[in-house]
Amino acid sequence: ALSLRRLPGSERLTVSGSIGQLAKESARLVAVDSPSAYFARALRRVLVERGIEVTGPAVDVRALDVKPVLDPVEPFFVHHSPPLSDAARVLMKVSQNLYAETFLKTIGAVAGEGGNAESGRKEVARVLQSWGIPPEEYVLADGSGLSRYNYLTPHMLVTILERIYRDPRHRDPFIAALPVGGEDGGTIARRFKG
């Protein structure tokens, strides 16, 4: 068995353990420590590899003491995401936490409140309230569900699942996105294998 270890704030991954001579190839997914900093470094590297001059290091804007003034700015690149149903399949089948965090921020941006977690939480609260789910039934600390401060009641979960199932626009894409134990990747890939 192998174990993967990375110190917080480090990009160095330590792999330890043993692998049998006849072991099959396998892949392990590892979360990045800071998705926005990782993206900034990856973007800088790709730009340089493509011959685009980049001065200075990649910087996570959230780590700056003084925030840059960004208005007005002209976008230099626009990327249109795949349909939500496709992204949801990746999020749920592979347990892609980066997607989950991004979904929460995107919800806030689409609602016109800004693309951040707080605006996403406000919009989620508004929708849940319209579905009859009061704020006392949950705490949404982050998009991925990894925070120990997230919680929800069984009533809330059942209400959401029933609502999705009864909505013909969302039922089939949602069911298609659900992970299947022992078949799909992510956190349940090795379950239900006998």
Q: Where are each of the predicted segments found?
A:
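A small/polar active-site loop signature that marks catalytic segments
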Residues: 2-168, 172-173
